């Protein structure tokens, strides 16, 4: 008898998450030198991690025979101070994606519903369906921002979680403070609102969502060390929420979920504000470069407040494959319902120039 015959049907129906294509895999498949490949597919930090984080990893490496602090006391204390909240209002995970999973563990079941934007982080539907919940997509507005009135209309008595990605991924648009305030004034109490702010550092004027935590609302604010802080390979993210919400999430969390190297690196990275400043400045320069290049090429793009940009190329998957064959990895968007578009992460000036050179070749 096949094991699939008695497995959970909603798990069998899932499509596994597809990350940006790794450099090593591309090199193997195409016979390329890994050092000649430019990866602009996963919104990573092109400047790398903070040197202080690297030093912290080296100092901590000799202690990996000892279990880490399961409560991540020092890191959570630093996060609480940085965000202006209490220690008990913090939870850390192996990337903010683990905190998303904890939320789903705590709240979802086959009778529950989740509301999110049509073009949103693909882990939302994966995690929702993993727990058997119905996933309700709300189309974006004409300016590509979240339609929060549409979210309100989609909420039912069975809705348990609403995901608001701000800035959005893969689009890069931002919902403003007034729209969020209006939404929060109307959202029912039986709904947990999750503000996913993975790209917040790149936004010019990010709204204040932590005020809802301080007010004791049913919210979780998600942030990460994977993007602006350059620690994607260590998987460190966190959530800020009222203490009852955090207490619930900690009950679902696996013990020792954040290893010692990740904790020490994140602590050091959080203190290195100058590295984040340089990262944001590099991103702004890269964004200006791409916008000018697209303007000259006559391509449509969506102004982005993230560290990536969405551009319309007509045959997204084919352009992705053609660029891949030339050693430049971008991200096709057919999986997000945007088959004519590709997403390009902002790289170093040299990487950005190479990307545009190759894009011109394949179009």
Curated annotation (Swiss-Prot):
GO biological process, alphabetically ordered: L-histidine biosynthetic process
Catalytic activity: L-histidinol phosphate + 2-oxoglutarate = 3-(imidazol-4-yl)-2-oxopropyl phosphate + L-glutamate
Swiss-Prot/TrEMBL keywords: Amino-acid biosynthesis, Aminotransferase, Histidine biosynthesis, Pyridoxal phosphate, Transferase
Catalytic EC class: transferase
Tagged with keyword Coiled coil: no
Cofactor(s) listed in the protein's UniProt record: pyridoxal 5'-phosphate
Transmembrane domains' residue ranges: none
EC code: 2.6.1.9
Modified residues (N6-(pyridoxal phosphate)lysine): 227
Family, as annotated: Belongs to the class-II pyridoxal-phosphate-dependent aminotransferase family. Histidinol-phosphate aminotransferase subfamily.
Xref: PANTHER family: HISTIDINOL-PHOSPHATE AMINOTRANSFERASE, HISTIDINOL-PHOSPHATE AMINOTRANSFERASE 2
Name this polypeptide is given: Histidinol-phosphate aminotransferase
Originating species: Akkermansia muciniphila (strain ATCC BAA-835 / DSM 22959 / JCM 33894 / BCRC 81048 / CCUG 64013 / CIP 107961 / Muc)
